[in-house]
UniProtKB/Swiss-Prot annotation:
Task of the protein: One gap junction consists of a cluster of closely packed pairs of transmembrane channels, the connexons, through which materials of low MW diffuse from one cell to a neighboring cell.
Domain of life according to the entry: Eukaryota
Protein name (database record): Gap junction alpha-4 protein
Cytoplasmic side: 1-20, 100-148, 231-333
Source species of the chain: Homo sapiens (Human)
Record-level GO cellular component terms: connexin complex; gap junction; plasma membrane
Bias type Low complexity, positions: 323-333
UniProt KW ATP-binding keyword: no
Length: 333
């Protein structure tokens, strides 16, 4: 096997900008795929062609039967699977690096604009444009990029591509080899003169390895699907929170009708502490309220001394009498 160190370093950088499910997927890829294949792959499949024997001495028959039995070696097929499945993740890493470099350039440009002594309209407009561009790049407090906006689209697309590629390679493995390694392969292909029986070395061990890689592939596929569900739920929750923030009701005291559910009281007025308080306005009709106002005015008039004394009557004239209470009451009714 070749050196996987470079690919591991690249995928390790992706782990810093992935979700929890994405980190688990990378762990499965590192430990149960690349590491196991690198350690045990050569020892299990190293004798794949050398120990493939057929019961014929016809020159070239063994080679053509091996080609028919294994169109591509299992171990090379799995290496191609790892490379293709990792490619969408590397594309996402490229987008992360691009946004990180862009955010650094925007911060540098913002610092240069703020350092200018004179603030003319052009500088203000340029600074506002830089701030708008920086607002599109969401950076956490620890310096990691948040998966939002365009980065979210790239991440979802990468997970979708990984799922499709994973399912495609699993289907291809089933079509090419099946899920078991048969100990005897029957071949009929030119230049073989007749049906030839070919024998595979250590078929049981290879069957166990095939099943192990199949289970790991299914786990990776399930993790990709779970990550899609996780991303969908995250997007829906953010949308619901944003909608609730827009549709939030106004705070108490800011109602459009300032007199809603308010009761107005009249202060009690009387000659002594035992005087009954005046009833509320909301509890009386208009006629009853007028009568109550009239009674209050009469009490006030009787308790205050007159401000001006009337002149004595002359020539036998009678002093003008007060208007009758009935006439006064009529004007309030």
């Amino acid at each position: 096997m070749g050196d996987w160190g470079f690919l591991e370093k690249l995928l390790d950088q992706v782990q810093e900008h992935s979700t929890v499910v994405g980190k688990i997927w990378l762990t499965v890829l590192f430990i149960f795929r690349i590491l196991i294949l690198g350690l045990a792959g050569e020892s299990v499949w190293g004798d794949e062609q050398s120990d493939f024997e057929c019961n014929t001495a016809q020159p070239g028959c063994t080679n053509v039967c091996y080609d028919q039995a294994f169109p591509i070696s299992h171990i090379r097929y799995w290496v191609l699977q790892f490379l293709f499945v990792s490619t969408p993740t590397l594309v996402y890493l490229g987008h992360v690096i691009y946004l990180s470099r862009r955010e650094e350039r925007l911060r540098q440009k913002e610092g240069e604009l703020r350092a200018l002594p004179a603030k003319d309209p052009q500088v203000e407009r340029a600074l506002a444009a830089v701030e708008r561009q920086m607002a599109k790049i969401s950076v956490a407090e620890d310096g990691r990029l948040r998966i939002r906006g365009a980065l979210m689209g790239t991440y979802v697309a990468s997970v979708l591509c990984k799922s499709v590629l994973e399912a495609g390679f699993l289907y291809g493995q089933w079509r090419l080899y099946g899920w078991t390694m048969e100990p005897v392969f029957v071949c009929q292909r030119a230049p073989c003169p007749y049906l030839v029986d070919c024998f595979v070395s250590r078929p049981t061990e290879k069957t166990i390895f095939i099943i192990f890689m199949l289970v790991v592939g299914l786990i990776s596929l399930v993790l990709n699907l779970l990550e899609l569900v996780h991303l969908l739920c995250r997007c829906l929750s953010r949308g619901m929170r944003a909608r609730q923030g827009q549709d939030a009701p106004p705070t108490q005291g800011t109602s459009s009708d300032p007199y809603t559910d308010q009761v107005f009281f009249y202060l009690p007025v009387g000659q002594g502490p035992s005087s009954p308080p005046c009833p509320t306005y909301n509890g009386l009709s208009s006629s009853e309220q007028n009568w109550a106002n009239l009674t209050t005015e009469e009490r006030l008039a009787s308790s205050r001394p007159p401000l001006f004394l009337d002149p004595p009557p002359q020539n036998g004239q009678k002093p003008p009498s007060r208007p009758s209470s009935s006439a006064s009451k009529k004007q309030y009714v």
